[in-house]
């Protein structure tokens, strides 16, 4: 990170890391990469900077997660002042630094195919719509976000026609690979 940006984080009340790459390193930090990329929180920690980081992962992050997190922070700051308001926002983060209002629910437990999973009925192909796609590589059981409810711009979400690849998780992409398997 350039020195100017690093200095800005010293005086910032908090930093929002938007997208999985900014939050955890994402694809640039994947195995085999020579970039030495890392998430914002890891980079600040390495530099000894204690500014709180709020991670808004996703590839891409859902726009409501970004706007909602900013609105939540502004509301808490207005109600309680800067320090107490930000402390409350930080208390609403999960262990990975994500806001629980958006990342507190498991994708698998809210999947429209959960009943098929429970019945043991799995799809053999991506075009087969009558079964759970877990056997095809769906990462929903280990993924947390509310995309099942919010969708992208209220229109659609990954599992509607494909599988969850776990893009909101710190282990993405290496820990979520291979994306497709049988």
PLM ranges: what are they?
Residues 1-137, 141, 148, 154, ...:
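Iron-sulfur-associated redox domains of electron-transfer enzymes in respiratory
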Residues 138-182:
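Long, low-complexity C-terminal extensions of enzymes
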């Amino acid at each position: 990170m350039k020195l100017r940006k690093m200095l800005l984080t010293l005086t910032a009340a908090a930093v929002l890391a938007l997208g999985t790459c900014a939050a955890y390193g994402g694809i640039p930090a994947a195995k085999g990469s020579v970039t030495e990329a890392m998430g914002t929180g890891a980079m600040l920690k390495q530099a000894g900077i204690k500014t709180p980081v709020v991670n808004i992962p996703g590839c891409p992050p859902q726009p409501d997660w970004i706007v909602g997190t900013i609105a939540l922070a502004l509301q808490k700051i207005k109600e309680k002042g800067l320090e107490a308001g930000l402390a409350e926002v930080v208390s609403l983060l999960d262990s990975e630094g994500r806001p629980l209002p958006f990342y507190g629910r498991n994708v698998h437990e809210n999947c429209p195919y959960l009943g098929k999973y429970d019945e043991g009925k799995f799809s053999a192909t991506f075009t087969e719509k009558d079964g759970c796609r877990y056997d095809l590589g769906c990462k929903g059981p280990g993924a947390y976000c509310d995309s099942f409810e919010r969708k992208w711009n209220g229109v659609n979400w990954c599992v509607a026609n494909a599988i969850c690849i776990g893009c909101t998780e710190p282990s993405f992409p290496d820990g979520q690979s291979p994306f497709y398997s049988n």
